[in-house]
Amino acid sequence: RDPHHTISTVAMTGGGSFPQPGEISLAHNGILYLDELPEYSRNVLEVLRQPLEDRKITVSRIRCNVEYPASFMLVASMNPCPCGYYTHPTKACVCSPGQVQKYLNRISGPLLDRIDLQIEVTPLPFEEMADSRPGESSATIRERVIRARQIQEARYADIPGIYCNCLLYTSPS
């Protein structure tokens, strides 16, 4: 799923007079990709928190409450600053420190806490992208993924409903 950054909170969560699932539920068992993360409204970003934690979302309306599954992988991308050149190896950033901070603050700490992996990707020069050396084939990568899933399946064979690490819970002490 790849919703536009102008999406409404209702379209993201689901709703309506007769509740329908939103993008969060439609991404169940898949990927929800948010490009230009800070461009989404604060409300839209904040409604992601609970489903990321609980893997379900409840849509409450006057007539009823509906619970939808919401076990998805959130993949998001963003620039390091409004102009996009902060930390760029060859281009100068034109943003003030205050502008950079304001831009980064559009994403709350609690939401960032739910994003398990954060990577800074530096731009590649065209020459490196155009390099004609063959990369790893999709078939080879596919086999590696299948093997990893088989290992996980064997690892959790005795635990019903668990097929990946994100479904594991620690017992309360």
Predicted regions and their residues:
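Conserved short S/T/G-enriched processing/targeting/catalytic segments and their helical context
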Residues: L32, C64, A70-L168
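Conserved small/polar residues in nucleotide/adenosyl-binding loops
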Residues: Y169-S173
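Conserved ASCE/P-loop NTPase catalytic core
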Residues: R1-N105
